[in-house]
Design a protein with these regions (language model features):
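Conserved functional hotspots at enzyme active or ligand-binding sites that engage polyanionic ligands
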Residues: 1-103
Length: 103
């Protein structure tokens, strides 16, 4: 598991399995029991705290990373790799995360 990967995660009921982006820095992941994630959703609102993803990013359909809903979860609940975001897309994600946190 690495920073910038998109993986499957099963949220608590009634939600189902959704893709999430690993936000925790790679160097820390092996030392932690939990990791910070950002959910990926097909609900696109075109706001500064979203990062648009599509086929070029390895996703089956257009969607967004929603940085308004980051959370820290058990690594045990994180599933299979879907894709890894490019360095350029991670720069965009960083800006959206800073905006979401008020920086």
């Amino acid at each position: 598991m690495l920073h910038g990967e998109i993986r499957w995660y099963r949220f608590g009921r009634p939600d189902k399995r959704h893709p999430v982006v690993i936000v925790t820095r790679s160097a820390a992941i092996d030392y932690l029991n939990e990791t910070t994630i950002a959910p990926v959703t097909r609900t696109i609102r075109d706001i500064p705290t979203e990062v648009l993803l599509g086929a070029v990013d390895g996703m089956a359909e257009d969607c967004v990373v929603n940085l308004d809903h980051i959370q820290t979860v058990s690594k045990d609940k994180i599933g299979a790799l879907i894709t890894t975001l490019s360095e350029e897309k991670m720069k965009t994600l960083r800006q959206a995360l800073l905006f979401a946190l008020g920086f």
